[in-house]
Amino acid sequence: DVVWHGNTTMSVASTIRDAYALGLGADHIVNNWAMDENLPKLAGKASEGVMGAAMCAFYGEDVPLMPKVVEYGKKYNPGVPREKRTVRAIQAWSNALALWEALKRADKAGGLGGENILKKGFETMKGFDLGLGGAPLTYTATDHRISGQVPIYVIKEGKIMLVEAIDLKARWPQKWANEWLGW
């Protein structure tokens, strides 16, 4: 049996703990918003084997821009110890860096108006790597989906470990092209 959790860490941890205590014996798959460093802390042994996707590296993982993120974390939030920092910081950095890049491109192309940021900023990105463990960004006028590369993680012995990155576009090209459309 498999249980899919489409919620945030605290409610998922509670559900997983309860399922474990009741001996329900199901495997658990969680969404991006539940797969973070707090899940094994909150769910304890019940989180063993939980799998989920993440859209970027976890705090401290070996990716090119992580030293800069860690440096700025120490500089601007010195009271927060490293073990309290989470993937959410990396998500925020990723979002800010993507917007910054789009703004630079739009400005260079003639203006920072809303439509220009989309058309001359985001939609000019092709294989743009943020350096934070996420898939390279490619946006077009007709496709604003992620690149299709999704890292899958598992919790083992209280640690979040990368299993593999799945390339959805390569693995299921027909579904990607014809069914999994969206913005």
Walk through the language-model features, giving the residues of each.
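Extracytosolic ligand-binding ectodomains
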Residues: 1-183
